[in-house]
Amino acid sequence: MPKNKSIIYQVQETLKQKLCIGEQKHFAKQLGTASDGIYSWSTYKTYLAKSCAFVKWARAQHGCRTLAEARNYVNTYIKHHIDKGYSPYTQKTIASSLAKLYGCSTKDFTPTQTRHRANITRSRKGIAKFSESRNKEFVDFCRATGLRRHEIKNLKPENLSYDESTGKYMLVNIKGKGGRLRDCPILSKEAVEHIQNTPAGKPVWSKIPSRADIHSYRADYCKTIYNLQARPIAEIPKRDRYYCRGDLKGIVYDKRAMAVASRALGHNRISIIASNYLYNWIERGGDL
C-alpha cells in the first residue's frame, strides 16, 4: 500500500478487500476460509468504526502512520479499554475488529474479560415511548414471523408461499445476516392476510416503528416454534438433550426442537437460541 495514503484510508481499503457480501459463510466455513471475510454490512460498519478509532488513537498517542506501525500497540489499546472499565462485550468487539483488520486471531492479542450472558441487557426492559397496544398489528406480525428489522423492511408479497404438503403458508427466500436465505413458518392467519392484502412488488410494511423491541418478538416466535416441536424432556434420549451451563445450569432443552426454531430464526447454532432467545423469553415472564 502506498506510503502517502492516510492510516484511515489504509483501514478502509484493507477491510473493503475482505467484503464477501452475498456469499455464503457456511460454504466458506467448510473450505476453512470463513475467518478471512466479512459477510454483512452491519459487521463491516462495526469493524470499520472500531478499527478507525484504534488507528486514530495510535496516530495521536504514538505517531503511527501505517497499519504495520500501529500493530505494535494493539495490546496496549485493548488493555487501555479493560483498565477503563469497558464491558467485556465492547472489549471483544474491539479485539474481533482488529483481528479482522490484521488477518489474525483474537488469541494473538491480550485476553479480554469473559462475557457473561447474565450481563446482556437487550430486550430485558420495556423500550420507552413505544406503545404495543397502538401498534398491535405490527407487534403481532413480528411475533408470527420472527423476522429481523431489515428482513421486515425488505419483505414483499412475493416472499409468501403455500406449502401443499403441510397445508400451511411459509415465508420463503428471506435474506438474513450474511446474505443467507431461509424459509420460515408463519404462525397466524392474520399475518398471512396482511401479506396477501399488500400489492405485488410493494413493501409489506412501509413504516417500521423505530422503537419496537423486535428482538423480544423474535424470542416470542422462537418460544412458540420450540414448543410446537418439543418433546417431554423425560422421553428424550440423553444424546438429544441440550444441557445449559453457567447461570443457566439446570435448564434442559430438546435439541431437535431447538434446531427447528434456530433455522426459522436464521441461526446456525442452537446455543444462540438457548442463551439469547428461549431464556430471554423466560426472564420476561414466560414459561416453557
Model-inferred region functions:
Residues K168-I174, K238-Y253, A257-L288:
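Short functional hotspots where side chains directly engage DNA or cofactors
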Residues I120-R149, V252-M258:
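Basic, Lys/Arg- and aromatic-enriched nucleic-acid-binding interface segment
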Residues C142-G167:
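Short, charged phosphate-coordinating catalytic segments
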Residues K175-Y221:
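C-terminal catalytic core of Y-nucleophile DNA break-rejoin enzymes
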Residues M1-C52, K56:
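Basic/aromatic DNA-contact patch characteristic of tyrosine site-specific recombinases
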Residues D36-S105:
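Non-catalytic DNA-binding core/recognition domains of DNA-processing enzymes
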